Design a protein with these regions (language model features):
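Structured interaction patches on ligand/partner-binding surfaces of diverse proteins
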Residues: 61, 140-179
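Acidic, low-complexity Ser/Thr/Gly/Pro-rich repeat segments typical of extracellular/periplasmic
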Residues: 1-121, 125-128, 133-137, 151, ...
Length: 184
C-alpha cells in the first residue's frame, strides 16, 4: 500500500491540534496521533482515499477506523445535505463541523470538535458521535485551517442534537470581512 495527500484527506474526529502521521511499511499501515487523547471518547479515523492499493494505486474509499478511550463506542449519528446558495448547487467540497461550545466566535477562533466532509452530492454523515447537543457549521474552507476566514462560504450556526437526519438542506453563503468584525 501507499498513501497520498494524507494531511488533506485524512480526518480524525474529535479533531487533533497536530496532524496525525501515517507510516507505511510494506502491507502495514501505522497511524500515530500526536495529541493527548480525551478520556471516555470515541475516535473516528476517516481515510477518504489517502490510502492506495499497491497493485493499481486505486484509492480505498469509505474506509473508517474506530476506537474508544472508554468502555464503549458512541453511537450517535447526524446527516444532511449542504448547498452553495451562490450557485444553487450541492457543495461537494464543504467541511461540516461540530462544536461543543455555544460561543458565536468559536468558528473563527477554534478548530471544530468533530469534522466530516460532504460528498459529490453535498451529503454528509457523522457516525459514532456522543449523544448531546452540538453547534453545526458548514464551511467551504479555502485555506484548510478549519476556521472561518474572510471570503469563505459558511452556513448559519445550527443547534442540533445527535441522532438526527436534518430534513432541510443547509445553505452556505459568502462571508465577508464586514460581518467578521461584528463576531469578534
Amino acid at each position: 500500500i501507499t498513501t497520498i495527500k494524507v494531511n488533506e484527506l485524512l480526518i480524525v474526529s474529535p479533531t487533533q491540534n497536530q496532524n496525525p502521521v501515517l507510516d507505511v511499511k510494506g502491507k502495514e499501515l501505522t497511524l500515530s496521533l500526536k495529541d493527548t487523547l480525551l478520556p471516555n471518547t470515541t475516535y473516528t479515523v476517516k481515510f477518504n482515499g489517502c490510502v492506495l492499493d499497491v497493485n493499481e494505486n486505486n484509492p480505498i474509499l469509505d474506509y473508517s477506523y474506530l476506537f474508544s478511550t472508554g468502555l464503549y463506542l458512541d453511537s450517535g449519528k447526524l446527516s444532511g445535505h449542504i448547498k452553495d446558495i451562490t450557485t444553487n448547487l450541492p457543495c461537494n467540497t464543504c467541511n461540516v463541523q461540530l462544536y461543543t461550545s455555544n460561543s458565536d466566535s468559536v468558528i473563527i477562533k477554534h478548530k471544530p470538535d468533530y469534522l466530516t466532509k460532504t460528498n459529490e452530492t453535498g451529503y454528509f454523515q457523522f457516525n459514532n458521535l456522543p449523544t448531546r447537543n452540538f453547534k453545526l457549521v458548514a464551511l467551504k474552507d479555502v485555506n484548510k485551517n478549519l476556521m472561518l476566514d474572510n471570503n469563505e462560504l459558511v452556513s448559519l450556526a445550527t443547534e442540533i442534537y445527535t441522532d438526527k437526519i436534518i430534513p432541510d438542506t443547509i445553505n452556505i453563503f459568502p462571508f465577508y470581512q464586514s460581518s467578521f468584525t461584528t463576531m469578534v
